[in-house]
Amino acid sequence: MMKHTLLILMLLICGMSASAQLTLKSDKGDFEARLIGRALFDGGVFFSDKTSLGNAVEVYDVRVGTVVRFLERWTGKIEMGFAKSKVSMKDIYIEYNDGKNLFRIGHCYEPFSLEYRIGTSDMKFNGAAVTGIAFGDRRRLGISYTYNCDVLNVSGGVFSDKDIDNTEKGDEGYAFSGRVLFRPYSKEKNVIHVGVSSRFGVQGEAEENKLTYSAGAPSNLISEKFLKAEVTDAINEWKFGAEVVMVLDRWYFQSEYLMAHVNRKASVENYTGDGWYAQVGYALLNGRYGYNKTSGMA
């Protein structure tokens, strides 16, 4: 057990990213292809009275992909990740967006929760909140629909409950996800939104009827999972989330509550876990935080 450990997050642990893009456009402007890529760095100096944590600097993830826009309202994206010497599939989807209606199919995030869905290119801190990592969303194969207007954003989707990297045989589970946002204040670039989301998933043989909730320290240098619960004999899972986001001038505030409940076979007790977080930021050097109304994320 690590006691009295101090992580100097603001000064001694630094998360950095470097990104690059190459864009090709047609003369008529009806086709555009962008090659995207970024590298994510992490470094830290740790002080501990008992547990020995090594000071280090590392490249913890590299992303490479392409985004293609065609026929005015269609977009396709393929992105791969190379973290810890392993190749993983990230966003692989095609979508149609007419401004108010968005249809998406492929390997992408379900419309549930907020923090863990924020892309690495848009992260505001060194890593995602522990609550978001443990109970938040994951990418799955499926289809979703989003309706968006000035004051309202409603999303829903149907997905496979199997991780795309899971090679186990057997019937896959399935999941239904939904998210509703209300923006009581929206003026120019300032916005306040409140929202709720829910997810219902049924585990299949391919998932071995097991669910794992885990999270570690807010640094990629520490691989240990300090919070971990393996829930076996799972029948189905309910998740619920509530969120608040405020982007006002240079200020940014985000808070979220997430809860997971697992119904298990009669021989064992059901599992319920929850958590919450709050984070605030202030943009320096004449900058400000942005907000995407379609995704409902700052």
For the regions a language model picked out, list residue spans one by one:
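Single-residue recognition of alpha-helix boundary sites
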Residues: 14-15, 117, 161, 260
